[in-house]
Amino acid sequence: MNYFDLPKIDLHCHLDGSVRPQTIIDLADEQNLTLPSRDINVIKEMMVAPETCPNLDEYLKRFELPGMVMQTAEALERISFELFEDAANENVKYLEVRFGPLLHQVKGLSLDDIMDSVVRGMKRAEAQYDIHGNYILSILRTMPKDQIKAVLEAGAKHLNDGIVAFDLAGSEVPGFCHEFVPYAQYAKELGYRITIHAGEQGAGQNVYDAISLLGAERVGHGIFIHNHPEAYQLVKGEEVALETCPSSNVQTKAVNSLSEHPIKAFYKDGIAVTINTDNRTVSNTTMTDEVRKVVEAFELTEAEYFDIYTISVNNAFTSDAVKQHLLSFAQ
């Protein structure tokens, strides 16, 4: 299999974890910000997580530099465009990018400007390359909840025209879903699809709650259903897709090694698994890398790869017309 040439779909990719290191330097210059270094190798080292981190919080430290420069409309549009450009250049045909709008208000940028900027960057890339995309609004579980409705209302202007879904992300504690029931309900009332980060850090119960309490149609990571039979059966029975991110899961110690990742066992048992990057820069990866790692580690056939590709298409938060286009690559 030529992994680069294969059509690919990435349903779980974070904007601020996928910024080009050179872009950090360029934007810091434009914004008169002082970086710890102007050496691209030093900047890259600060942005890329080690192959294994002691925990998820250590991994999340790599987002500090992007957060510094992602405070203007121009920066957000550029970073959005470049992410879709990078993905298109390795034959990613459809990309869903998630980002936390509330993280980009340090300098007073309005929610409307933030939404407009990322969607504009994406649409510019769609016009130039053979790629389709959408944005997912991520709310960090640790942030104050009083602004969640405002985020959802601002995003609604682009609903199904660049923005499609609501997500909860960040550090995962047991039982977090109970606090967010009214917000997920409001998102659904407005027309958002729902995907929730859950079961990334040991609590299979969180996956059960994400589906049963929040109405998650997909789950980010979800790998700890392997030690929670009720969550496992719910995911399988409801055909909830898991957005697995193999390299990231090894880095954050969700699994000890790729060979121990449950993706193959899940797939063989009929669970809807998808292959994704999580963070292209922080995990120092591409979709080509992720597909290669999974196919080689678990000896998947080309037919099995295209089956997983088709699962990704069927679970994408996009129109039937785009899905038909994406399925044409699997013929």
Swiss-Prot record:
Q: Where along the chain is the active site annotated? A: E200 (proton donor)
Full protein name: Adenosine deaminase
Protein species of origin: Vibrio vulnificus (strain CMCP6)
Q: Which residues bind substrate?
A: H14, D16, G170
Which lineage ranks, top first, belong to the organism behind this chain? Answer: Bacteria, Pseudomonadati, Pseudomonadota, Gammaproteobacteria, Vibrionales
Q: Which residues are Zn(2+)-binding?
A: H12, H14, H197, D278
Record's HAMAP family? Answer: A_deaminase
Single GO cellular component term: cytosol
Q: Which family does the UniProt entry place this protein in?
A: Belongs to the metallo-dependent hydrolases superfamily. Adenosine and AMP deaminases family. Adenosine deaminase subfamily.
